[in-house]
From Swiss-Prot:
One protein family per Pfam: Dus
Annotated protein name in UniProt: tRNA-dihydrouridine(47) synthase [NAD(P)(+)]-like
Record key words, sorted: Acetylation, Flavoprotein, FMN, Metal-binding, mRNA processing, NAD, NADP, Oxidoreductase, Repeat, tRNA processing, Zinc, Zinc-finger
Zinc fingers (C3H1-type) by residue: 94-125, 138-163
Phylogenetic placement of the source organism: Eukaryota, Viridiplantae, Streptophyta, Embryophyta, Tracheophyta
Positions of region (Disordered): 55-94, 259-286
Names of required cofactors: FMN
Protein family per UniProt: Belongs to the Dus family. Dus3 subfamily.
Chain ranges passing through the membrane: none
Ranges of biased composition (kind: Basic and acidic residues): 262-279
Catalytic activity: 5,6-dihydrouridine(47) in tRNA + NAD(+) = uridine(47) in tRNA + NADH + H(+); 5,6-dihydrouridine(47) in tRNA + NADP(+) = uridine(47) in tRNA + NADPH + H(+); a 5,6-dihydrouridine in mRNA + NAD(+) = a uridine in mRNA + NADH + H(+); a 5,6-dihydrouridine in mRNA + NADP(+) = a uridine in mRNA + NADPH + H(+)
Amino acid sequence: MSDVIAEHAVDTSVEGDAKAALPVQSTKQFSVYEATSEELIERSMAPIKKEFLCPPPPSRSVKQNDAADVRAPQSGLVQEKKSKRQLKRERREQSTINLCPQVARTEDVDSCQYKDKCRFNHDIEAFKAQKADDIEGQCPFVASGMKCAYGLSCRFLGSHRDITGNSDDKEKSEMNFFNKETQRLLWKNKMTFTNADAKLKSLGLLGHAKKSNAAEEITAEKTQNGMNGTQATEVAVDSAVSSEHTSEMIQDVDIPGPLETEEVRPMKKAKSEDQKNSKTGDVGGVYDGVKLEEETKKNGYPTSKANVEDEDSIKIVETDSSLKLHPREKKKLIDFRDKLYLAPLTTVGNLPFRRLCKVLGADVTCGEMAMCTNLLQGQASEWALLRRHSSEDLFGVQICGSYPDTVSRVVELIDRECTVDFIDINMGCPIDMVVNKSAGSALLNKPLRMKNIVEVSSSIVETPITIKVRTAFFEGKNRIDSLIADIGNWGATAVTIHGRSRQQRYSKSADWDYIYQCTKNATTNLQVIGNGDVYSYLDWNKHKSDCPELSSCMIARGALIKPWIFTEIKEQRHWDITSGERLNIMKDFVRFGLQHWGSDTKGVETTRHFLLEWLSYTFRYIPVGLLDVIPQQINWRPPSYFGRDDLETLMMSESAGDWVRISEMLLGKVPEGFTFAPKHKSNAYDRAENG
């Protein structure tokens, strides 16, 4: 390359010997074999000991997802996208192959209550003939002293033995199961949210739904004399359902507009019309407490208990605002100080992984983010994210919503139906699908809506409300420091600050100096938790010593890559973990997964899927014994290297095919035509020029 540059320089020299004699700089090719540790770190490369380095493979382009190792043979035909009806038909046909769960459990074809109408197979002999081979090892239920609930369909059937345990022990070890009656009420829009709706109405946040409420009250008044009790009740119920449904539809609509718009405010013209004709009720204007009370008395509408409580609270405010109890004064106390907090992780932060982290030393756990709209629709898959294991002694759930009404109703519903220690509202999610619905980090541009969400949610339940935010929506436009002093007054118990903006994602290191600044600006009654790039006990110690006011640190990607980070922090050491110890940790995850998702074929493959999602993070771990400089930083890109044994080398592979091979060591062979592609781009590293 330097010869080409020199030749070009000679050919273009036209100003004499002086310019032609200028030296031509040659670019020396960088080599990881010759570079010092300092030079490697400057390039954000891991300083691995020279004896463990190896030449890179011939082609790196194939390894982007390396699904070719596990995909079915490709053909030139383009696969046609299946319709929902076709997929539903295929699922129905597949269910006829699967053995009825009740028959599998009891081994009695007459035990199924649906008899011939059951959509599952009742032919035990036919099922045994086509059932896949058993997996080596012991049934996770039998190993725990329980009776396996999957019976004949268990993939570890050969290890079953007569045991006096109860197959319902799973329900004792897990809680927050979704009640079918609750689901039915949500499906039919008959669920009541007394506290949330009363608070929303007192603050004027019900919006257009108030028109329906007023119509409901007028209808009830008119029908009292013209209908008997049963007819009046039916009309009232139908009107209430219509009102709730209308409110949900209106509040869930994402109205396009500038990001600075905080709330939809009433037109002055509409307000004047309302003043002229008060009998029509509120048409979306924001009422204060006195006006609401006067309208109720003037129109003679029936006053509920919730409205009486609202009137009392309004009178207290008018008399002396200092007498009103702050929402935090009525709440249960929760202390995050110096507790190891496992972040709520989408997809990989499932119940089995949280159990694993509890074993390894985590103190606080939180469920995966659940969308408020899906919870209000009664989606069982969304409610499954709220499930809790008995070992999670300090557990919270994380929800995400766009508007005060949907969030507050979900908060009231969770407080009523689930056992949780705190409810976290995600106001920092960067995912496009969430942001486009004005939820997650989009709320950072709408501080008034943030206030309304926190204020209403914290005032209707005794369960502590926490929020999670980022520094800002746009890079370079931090704004949490200007809101942190108010967040505590809104009623939040704690706030978690991720030291990046939504625009940054993971392109730069977390800004801990800004987190410290926000922590010092916070009120004394608000606990501040820092989040971002905690990857060793030294990181934890540094953040705690640099800012003593910081309550705790939330650990996210660090726990995914090396879940034993909790052990390292508690024991204050770098754990040079062996490949055998890492395999045992994976075995624990598989055991927890089979107990949670089931030991039948469906449960095994579900466990395999989430194991592979987790392995797409763990390969980034570099063993301590292979590094020249410790501890490893989360943004270091490793050169091509090998481990101290074959298993360690396999675990550090970025090939999806190698991850599948690890899963086969724990869960047997994959089904024919098995495919896997990671959901998250976990192999992305920060670029050196981004710091």
